[in-house]
Amino acid sequence: MRLIQNMCTIAEYPAPGNAAASDCCVGAAGRRLVKIAVVGASGVGKTALVVRFLTKRFIGDYERNAGNLYTRQVQIEGETLALQVQDTPGIQVHENSLSCSEQLNRCIRWADAVVIVFSITDYKSYELISQLHQHVQQLHLGTRLPVVVVANKADLLHIKQVDPQLGLQLASMLGCSFYEVSVSENYNDVYSAFHVLCKEVSHKQQPSSTPEKRRTSLIPRPKSPNMQDLKRRFKQALSAKVRTVTSV
């Protein structure tokens, strides 16, 4: 597995509508591109989640999250896709409202899907989910962006502040998939959360028909010859031949 870490921050992304953004569905080697942003409060394990998914390794300590972009290839239903995963700095809350920088908003607009992460050891991170989900959907008006809610640190039951069942109920109410994971102990659950998003985005990107089929459908099919008309022409030709033989 090849992993490329591009040391670029969300501030460096092309704004929606730019030429670079218009080609956002095509990745390296012409493969379809899937873009996922990982968001949530500070300290919930976003970076650990991303690195665990991409490398299968767990690293406990990280430097302050600067918003790095990671790229790899994934297999979804037999097709190789180019996947980009954007790690993001922790979201803050001021006076019961989200404080999202424009750089973070651009990252969310850039994404084809979003992972919202909270920690079962931090009730405030759980309280962010509804506001954050609403904010994500507001930045994608006119389309239903695929979102997965992930409850991290499931192994730390001795300091649990949030029952995972609450996360499941909230995710269901918001129309999102839900995964309870322990990034430090279980790779499979982490993989499943990202895989279901990649699959959903892949299905949304697939056109109803291929360009070749669409072009073919525009070409009028030749009309089938009328059988009665053919019989009439055949009789006329046969009668003419009989008259010619008789005259001779």
Swiss-Prot record:
Induction: By TGFB1.
Region Small GTPase-like, annotated ranges: 29-246
Catalytic EC class: hydrolase
Protein origin, superkingdom: Eukaryota
Binding site for GTP: 40-47, 87-94, 152-155
Region Disordered: start-end pairs: 205-226
EC number: 3.6.5.2
Entry annotated with the keyword Nucleotide-binding: yes
PROSITE patterns tied to this protein: RAS
Reactions mediated catalytically: GTP + H2O = GDP + phosphate + H(+)
GO BP: negative regulation of transforming growth factor beta receptor signaling pathway
GO terms assigned for molecular function: G protein activity; GTP binding; transforming growth factor beta receptor binding
Pfam families: Ras
Tissue: Widely expressed with highest levels in placenta and primary macrophages.
UniProt KW keywords: GTP-binding, Hydrolase, Nucleotide-binding
InterPro entries, per database record: P-loop_NTPase, Ras-related_GTPase, Small_GTP-bd, Small_GTPase
CDD domains documented for this protein: RERG_RasL11_like (cd04146)
Similarity comment text for this entry: Belongs to the small GTPase superfamily. Ras family.
NCBIfam families cross-referenced by the UniProt entry: small_GTP
Full protein name: Ras-like protein family member 11B
Gene transcribed to yield this protein: RASL11B
